[in-house]
C-alpha cells in the first residue's frame, strides 16, 4: 500500500507547486508539500458512481457544476479533492486552471493511507476556507459521513451506511441510494 509523504524541509507555495514536473500528485497545506498516492480502482469506481448521480441532480435542477481532480486554491494552499460542487451563483471562482476559493461541497473518498489526513488537515482547511458541506466516503466501512458548517467547526448532519439513502442539506431533494454507490 502506498503511503502519504509529507515534505517539511521548507515552506512550499503555490508557485513551487506549479514548478513540479513529475507524474506524482501533490497538495500543499500549511506550507507542507504532501505527496498523495494515486487512487485505487475501487476508489475511482465509487467516485464515478457519485458523479453519475450528482451530475444528474445538478443538470436537472440547474444547480451548479461538478469538478473532479481539480486544483482548489485557498490562498497559497492547494488541494485536489476527489469531487467538488460549485453552486451556480458562485461559478465565478472557477478559473481556467483551478478553482480559486471554497467549493460549496467537497467529497473525499477515504483510503487507508489518506484517511487521517482527510479527516484532520483537509477537514480543517475546508472549514477555515468556507466550504459549506463536506462528505467523507469510507469504502471499507461502506458509509458516508455528511458534515455541515457549524458556528466554530463542522457539525455532522448524518452518517449513512450502504443500506440507507443519503440526503444533503445543501442540495434539496437529492437522494442517493448508497447500495448503488458501494455495490461490488
Question: What do these predicted regions represent?
Answer:
Residues 1-184:
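Gly/Pro/Ser/Thr-rich low-complexity, intrinsically disordered segments predominantly at protein N-termini
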Amino acid at each position: 500500500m502506498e503511503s502519504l509523504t509529507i515534505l517539511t524541509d521548507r515552506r512550499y507555495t503555490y508557485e513551487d507547486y506549479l514548478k513540479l514536473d513529475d507524474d506524482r500528485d501533490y497538495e500543499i497545506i500549511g506550507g507542507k508539500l504532501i505527496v498523495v498516492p494515486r487512487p485505487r480502482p475501487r476508489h475511482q469506481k465509487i467516485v464515478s458512481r457519485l458523479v453519475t448521480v450528482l451530475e444528474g441532480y445538478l443538470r436537472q435542477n440547474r444547480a451548479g457544476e461538478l469538478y473532479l481532480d481539480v486544483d482548489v486554491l485557498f490562498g497559497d494552499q492547494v488541494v485536489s479533492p476527489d469531487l467538488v460542487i460549485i453552486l451556480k451563483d458562485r461559478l465565478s471562482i472557477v478559473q481556467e486552471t483551478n478553482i480559486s476559493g471554497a467549493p460549496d461541497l467537497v467529497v473525499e473518498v477515504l483510503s487507508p493511507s489518506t484517511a487521517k489526513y482527510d479527516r484532520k488537515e483537509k477537514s480543517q482547511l475546508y472549514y477555515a476556507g468556507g466550504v459549506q458541506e463536506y462528505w467523507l466516503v469510507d469504502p471499507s466501512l461502506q458509509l458516508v459521513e455528511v458534515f455541515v458548517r457549524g458556528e466554530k467547526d463542522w457539525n455532522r448532519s448524518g452518517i449513512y451506511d450502504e443500506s440507507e439513502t443519503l440526503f444533503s442539506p445543501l442540495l434539496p431533494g437529492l437522494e442517493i441510494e448508497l447500495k448503488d454507490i458501494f455495490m461490488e
